[in-house]
C-alpha cells in the first residue's frame, strides 16, 4: 500500500493547496490541518480513502470533548475516517489487510523520564496558552494534557496487544499506527535538541513499536 502523508498544514494561515500524490492508495492526515476545520472540506472528494487523526491545534479555543464530537460529525459528513482511540481495517491493492490504529496520543511529558517531568510540564505552559483549550470549564493545562495522554497510551498498548481474528472482518495482516505526537525522541527536530520543550512534541513510546509495520506521526 502506498500512503500519502499530510500533516501540520495549518491551512488557517498558510497558502497551500493539497493535491493527491500520483499512485497513492490512501491519504493520512496526521493532525494540525486547520484550526478552523473549514479546510477539511478539501478532502471530501479525494480520489483515495482519507484517514484523519486530530492534532492538538484542532482543539484550539474549544472544549476538547465537544470539539472531538464536532470533528466526528464533520468528518462523517465529508466521508473522512477520523480515528481517535479507534482502529480501521482496509484491504490493500495486494490483498493484505491493513489495520490502522489512530490516536492523537497527547504528550505525557515523560520523554526524558519521570525525574525531568516537572521541567517538561513547566515548559509546556507556553504551548497550553497558545492552544487555549478547555475541558469541563477548566483550562486544559499540562496536568490535564498528561491525564489524557496516559489514557491514550493505555488504549494504544492494549490495542497493539490484540491478535487478528481469523476468518472475520476483524482480521488483519499488518498494523500501521497513526499519532499526531511523535512516538520517540528520534522523531524530534534535531534543531531543538534535548530541551524540556521537546517533551511537548514527542513521547517515549519506543516500547510499543515491536510488531508495528509503520508508525506515522505529525508535528
Regions found by a protein language model. Give the residues of each.
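Conserved beta-sheet core of the metallophosphoesterase superfamily
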Residues: 41-45, 49-53, 96-99, 183-219
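Active-site-proximal loop/helix segment associated with metal-binding centers of metalloenzymes
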Residues: 101-176, 181-192
Amino acid at each position: 500500500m502506498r500512503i500519502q502523508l499530510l500533516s501540520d498544514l495549518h491551512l488557517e494561515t498558510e497558502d497551500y493547496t493539497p493535491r493527491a500524490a500520483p499512485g497513492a492508495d490512501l491519504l493520512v492526515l496526521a493532525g494540525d490541518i486547520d484550526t478552523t476545520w473549514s479546510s477539511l472540506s478539501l478532502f471530501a472528494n479525494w480520489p483515495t480513502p482519507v484517514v484523519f487523526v486530530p492534532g492538538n491545534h484542532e482543539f484550539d479555543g474549544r472544549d476538547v470533548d465537544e470539539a472531538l464530537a464536532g470533528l466526528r460529525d464533520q468528518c462523517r459528513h465529508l466521508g473522512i475516517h477520523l480515528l481517535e482511540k479507534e482502529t480501521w481495517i482496509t484491504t490493500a491493492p495486494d490483498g493484505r489487510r491493513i489495520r490502522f490504529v489512530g490516536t492523537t496520543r497527547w504528550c505525557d511529558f515523560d520523554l526524558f523520564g519521570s525525574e525531568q517531568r516537572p521541567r517538561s510540564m513547566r515548559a509546556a505552559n507556553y504551548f497550553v496558552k497558545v492552544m487555549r483549550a478547555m475541558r469541563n470549564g477548566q483550562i486544559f493545562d499540562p496536568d490535564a494534557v498528561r491525564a489524557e495522554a496516559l489514557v491514550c497510551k493505555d488504549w494504544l498498548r492494549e490495542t497493539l496487544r490484540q491478535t487478528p481474528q481469523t476468518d472475520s472482518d476483524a482480521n488483519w495482516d499488518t498494523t500501521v499506527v497513526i499519532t499526531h505526537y511523535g512516538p520517540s525522541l528520534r522523531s524530534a527536530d534535531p534543531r531543538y535538541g534535548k530541551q524540556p520543550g521537546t517533551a511537548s512534541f514527542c513521547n517515549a513510546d519506543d516500547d510499543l513499536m515491536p510488531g508495528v509495520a509503520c508508525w506515522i506521526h505529525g508535528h
